[in-house]
Amino acid sequence: GTTLLRDLLRLHPHLECPEETHFFRWPDPYASPRFMHPYTQNKFIKKQREMDGISEQEFIHLIETSNSRSELAEAYGNLFLKKQNNPHGRWFDKTPQNIYGILLISRLMPDSRFIHIHRNPLNVVASLLQGKVLSATGITDAISYWCEAMVIMNEYKRIAAYRVLEVSYEHLTSDPLGSMITILEFLEEDPDDYVLPDKFVHGEHNKYLDTLSEQQIKEVKQRCRPYYSMYGYE
């Protein structure tokens, strides 16, 4: 769902999004060896920077001149805007694992806003078990991806609900324009500047019906409580 939302947001002329930055993904202290390792050694992350048009030399300079995750993120985002020839635009990050760093993001980037896109856990689990984008080794960790994110988000909403907009993947795909108008208003971006091409979004296909057994479906529904019903999937 984050990729679709990213693609929809980037249709607005003021909004730009790099590939997933992962700057708030891991809990290790900023600039520590364990924090730095994936950014210097992970081929996938380095490839994403290449796709953003940011060279290794440029990234090293950003690291050397940043004293925190937020400084690095801001510097990276601003450089990316220049690479996109949109220096006065606004950048955002779609890294799904930002959920694990939401408290740090919230404190270090006080003007940030969060869009929580949620999807029927049955389809999430089915997708993770297929492993085309992100994979799970079994149904337990597949369910945990959904449940742990829900726990964190609902606890965060108790602190700063006004900074969060929750968007249903199912509603986004059934009424993309209406959903995007709501999202853009939340972000204080002008919906009049937004144009959605025809057939840009396809509806939810409920692939879990062809992927999960009856027992697995029952297990997902049971273990995803109470959020399964709270979010209208009952």
Q: Whereabouts are the PLM-identified features?
A:
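PAPS-dependent sulfotransferases, especially Golgi type II membrane carbohydrate sulfotransferases
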Residues: Y30, L129-K132, A136-T137, C147-M150, ...
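PAPS/PAP-binding and catalytic site of the sulfotransferase fold
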Residues: G1-L15, G101-M109, N120, L165-P191
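Soluble or luminal CAZymes and related metallo-dependent hydrolases
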Residues: S68-A75, K94-Q97, D141-A149, D175, ...
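Conserved phosphate-donor/acceptor-positioning beta-strand/loop module used by diverse small-molecule
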Residues: K94-T95, L104-L129
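Short, solvent-exposed loop/turn segments at secondary-structure junctions
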Residues: H22-F24, Q97-I99, N120-N123, Q130-G131, ...
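Surface-exposed cleft-lining segments at the edges of enzyme active sites
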Residues: I63, N86-W91, L129-D141
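PAPS-dependent sulfation machinery
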Residues: E16-K94, N98-I99, Y228
